[in-house]
Design a protein with these regions (language model features):
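N-terminal export and membrane-targeting signals
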Residues: 1-11
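Non-catalytic macromolecular-recognition regions in eukaryotic signaling proteins
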Residues: 5, 19-195
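C-terminal motif of bacterial Sec signal peptides marking the signal peptidase cleavage site
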Residues: 14-17
Length: 195
């Protein structure tokens, strides 16, 4: 019974807009699930998601997540009807930006690398884990769990909202690029929900 409740909570957390969570800020501590970012701790070019930072997972990703490379599930513009909701946040360099809280699902036992194109480095950061370290590239390395999919809290830190290209590489294979609407829609998507 407990595991069903936890799976339900994880899936609701991954698919909900999550607009009530406070984004990172210089004036307030990050809330649970928000990245710990401050001007004193600039983002690394690359960050790792520690396996022990995952939440209880799920047997399968939600319907509005696309499975990429058979090992990572993301809310891409191909399957999600609306952009992710984003709220004001402080970027790793102290400048204003936005944070879209959205969990990451990784298939157990797989090596997954997510990154943004070089043209977005310094303007876009990926953050997953507890508390999570922002980076232009994030790696989850062969995590194990009771469920097929392991959930990691976190999301996307962006200087400018828009349609964000995310590059995915699984087990050292070919890079695949998907689009995620962060605060603003990708072509074919509706706007982010308003609260």
């Amino acid at each position: 019974m407990r595991s069903l409740l936890v799976v339900g909570v994880v899936l609701v957390g991954l698919t909900a807009a999550c607009g009530t969570a406070d984004p990172p800020s210089r004036r307030q501590a990050p809330s649970p699930g928000s990245p710990a970012v401050s001007p004193a701790s600039p983002a690394a070019a690359s960050a790792s998601v520690r396996c022990d930072e995952g939440m209880d997972g799920a047997a399968a990703p939600p319907a509005d997540f696309q499975v990429v490379g058979g090992a990572v599930a993301l809310p891409t513009s191909d399957v999600r009807e609306a952009a992710l909701q984003a709220s004001e946040a402080t970027m790793p360099d102290g400048s204003p930006g936005s944070f879209a809280k959205q969990g990451l699902l990784v298939r157990r036992g797989r090596h997954v690398e997510l990154s943004v194109p070089e043209s977005l480095t310094g303007r876009t950061w990926l953050v997953w884990g507890k508390p999570g370290s922002p980076g232009a590239r994030v790696v989850a390395d062969r995590c194990q769990g009771d469920k097929e999919w392991i959930a990691f809290p976190g999301g996307y830190l962006v200087r400018d909202m828009g349609c964000l290209p995310i590059r995915v590489r699984v087990d050292g294979g070919a890079v695949q690029e998907v689009l995620i609407g962060v605060g603003a829609p990708c072509p074919g998507q509706g706007p982010a929900p308003q609260i």
